[in-house]
Structure formats: structure tokens, C-alpha cells
Amino acid sequence: MNTQSPKRPHLVVLSGAGMSAESGLSTFRDSDGLWAGHDVQEVASIEGWYRDPQCVLDFYNQRRREFVGAEPNEGHRLLSRLEDYYRVTIVTQNVDDLHERAGSSRVIHLHGELMKNRSVRDPFTTYPAEGATRELHVGDLAPDGTQLRPFIVWFGEEVPEMIPAIEATEEADLFLVIGTSLEVYPAAGLLGYVPAKAPVYCIDPKPVRSSYRPDLIHIQAGAVAGMRNLYARLTEGR
């Protein structure tokens, strides 16, 4: 069993869509600005919810079906195994549960968790998306009597988990970015909180650069191949 000893170096990981893509899940949006054929603003914004809640629910019902068939990839499993050597905190932009299913014990979900529901009134109390509530429809109510919706942070909503993500980053001994661009929020923003003494690794198949950390260590590879490389580096001699 993995342990999270406070005496071990603290590795903070920021993971994004490229991590889940290697498990066969759709990335956030493609080159034409669509997400699985949908306009992002129609299905992932609070305005879209007010306009057509059933359209939004149908979209996330389909995504849940997709998630159920996905499995953690080798990259997820290697991150979990690093808990044998490091105290690991994963800050993920992904709304799937692949990190948890791979065995990671501390995961902060910036954008929510699709396998949970919440009411429109209470953004903090969650309910498992299982059985009859795996697929949501207009009229499905939470115990507080209001409409159930996915536990997702949409465009136009606050990101409450950003505070614990920043706090974890400020305590990092090493920092890893995997599956997301350094040029967009929150990756660029979180990098500003990494202690100057902490090495920063970035796994990305494309060239990268950062104004925050020009000394970052770039592993030019996809998520799985890059994690094989990094795992070997971080466990050598341990």
C-alpha cells in the first residue's frame, strides 16, 4: 500500500487533458473549438445551463458513459507508484476519476468530478452519480429539493479548489506539469507559486517555455512515455 509520509519530498503534479487522452477520453476541445461536436459555451457554461439544462445534462450523461469504459493508463499508475518514494499531491484539471482508480491518494480536482452530482442550491454537498442518478434529467431532485446537476465547475463559476491547489504548490519540493499547456491558466498561474528551489518538470510532446521558470526540465514525450522517463529519474538510487 502506498504511504504518504510527511518526511518524504513533496511532489506536486498538475495534470490535464493529455493525461486522460491516453486512456481514450476526449480532450477538452479540438482545433475547431468544439468539444465532442458541441459548442463549449453551450454545454460547459452557466449561461448554457440557464438556456437549456437538458442539453447540458445530455452532454454530461454521454461523457459519464464514456468515462465508465475508460481505464487508468500506465502514466496514472506510475504517478500512484511514486507515493512509495514521495508525498504526492495531484492537482488535476480533469473531471474523471482515473487518478483515484490508479491508486493516487491525494487528488485535488480544480474543475469538479463528473462521477458526482450536486444541487443547484448547494455547490459543496455532493452525491454519487450511480444507479438512477448516473444519467440526470430535468426534474431529478437533490435531497434539498432543487435540481441535480453535475459536480462540475463551468465557465462563469468560481474555482473553489484553487486555494488548496496553491497551498500545496507553495509547499512543493518538486513540481510536474503533464498533459496541459504551460501557456494557459491554471498551469501558468500555479507555476508562479512553486518555490524557487523546487525543480519543475514538464512532460509535453511539443516545445515548451515558461517566463516563470526558464530552467524547467522538459521531457518531450506524451504522458505515458514521459512518465516512464520521469519515474526512472525520480526513483533512481531510492
Listing of model-derived features with the role each one plays in the protein:
Residues 1-238:
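Conserved catalytic core of sirtuin-type NAD+-dependent deacylases
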